[in-house]
Amino acid sequence: MALDKDLASIQEARELVSAAYSAWQLWSKASQEQVDRVCAAMAEAAFGAAERLGRMAQEETGYGVAAHKKLKNEFASRNVWESIKDIKTVGVIGRDDARKIIEIAWPMGVVAALTPSTNPTSTVIYKILIAVKARDAIVLAPHPSAVRCCYEAASLMAQVAEANGAPHGLIGCMQNISLQGTNELMNHKYTAVILATGGTPMVRAAHSTGKPAYGVGPGNVPVYVDRSADVEKVARYIVASKAFDCSTICATEQAVVADMPIGNRLAQLMQEQGAYFTSESESDLLRTLLFNPDGGMNTATVGKPAITLAGMAGFSIPNDTRVLVCRLNRVGKEEPLSREKLTTVLGWYDANGWEKGCERCIELIQFGGRGHSLIIHARDDQVIMAFGLEKPVFRIAVNTMGTLGAIGMTTGLMPALTLGAGGVGGSITGDNITTYHLFNVKRLAYELSAPPAAALIPGEPVAGPGAREIEAVVRSVVEEILKIR
């Protein structure tokens, strides 16, 4: 008799984790040369399959643009591998002769990796590379709407890894997805660490297991455009960034905060790039379409082109429209469009001066993107530094596309598709998660100085009262109590 879906999912999780643990016991003894050979081969194979996997991801999920998913797959393979290939993850990885410290890498074990529907194959490629480079095993749990493409990406990398000497079972991917199966994966006794990329409920579940977990927070990313900015460049960047893969990367700009002296010019230039500024009635239609009564986003609108959204909402726009822009004046529950919008809809706020712009950005971050990211366009270094010092976020991308800058494609940040939101955002780190986060470091610490003399002198023994003394005290107390009565 066939198992029901939940039981089949639980059993699959158990089998994959057990196989991964057995494989990890072998892989943990691999040399640096073996690790790097396997990872390089996987990165090359994934890069070569980027177009096919991108097309599969778009067709299966219905989100985004296949050509942009291809670029994300190339980033997850080429850029991520280039950033970690020279990192030592085996044996002695560091020496400090002055402090007499020797550092030794130690793998964590089995990584339970939860992946989203918005960036499915690219996240699979990235997580496998950073885990295997750290000498970990990995078992992936894809989003239910992206199982086929994720399994294809994981299978490709597993086959290449095994062909280059990695043990069978080192890389696993669930196909029978259920809440119960995912919970079994995260809570399994052999799971060492959880790497969760996805919605807030999933990340909270990962943090509630009692296991070490790297999770992400929501990214309600504001972009401040200062009067000192190169406005023509900014207009190109904002529209291109928001339209990239139909805004499915969590670091995508969610609201423009425009310094008033350049606001009209910026709006005009963005229109020339394909931005359509909605009327108030059209904005109302989008509010109703994009968000459910409970405030959650309508998943049918995620990752959709602007022309599709307008049609769903019930109004017409030019066929060459890339982004819908809604002018807003409030932030909070009473303004749904001030939330994160993983689709081609962008908020717009006017601000008179960088101080007011700073305040508005903080409002947006506190409402839905604490710890995540912020974008600033300015040529005034004092304004840029003021934003860096005051904003409760851990990535501030300067004069670049938010989508590509925050993940490390166009900046010096570590290339990553899991972006920590720090303590203020409910994460353990504000880093772009990479292979460093998936192995521990042991330290040999040699004596630098002799211990203080007082630490070597035997202390006088401290003798407590004996049994007879205690009995006498108790008897005396009891007698006093009886006298009072």
PLM features: residue spans?
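Short, well-ordered beta-strand elements within core beta-sheets of diverse protein domains
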Residues: 21-28, 112, 255-258, 342-353, ...
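Short, flexible turn/loop "capping" segments at secondary-structure junctions
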Residues: 16-18, 215-217, 246-250, 335-342, ...
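Conserved C-terminal structural/oligomerization subdomain of aldehyde/semialdehyde dehydrogenase
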Residues: 2, 315-485
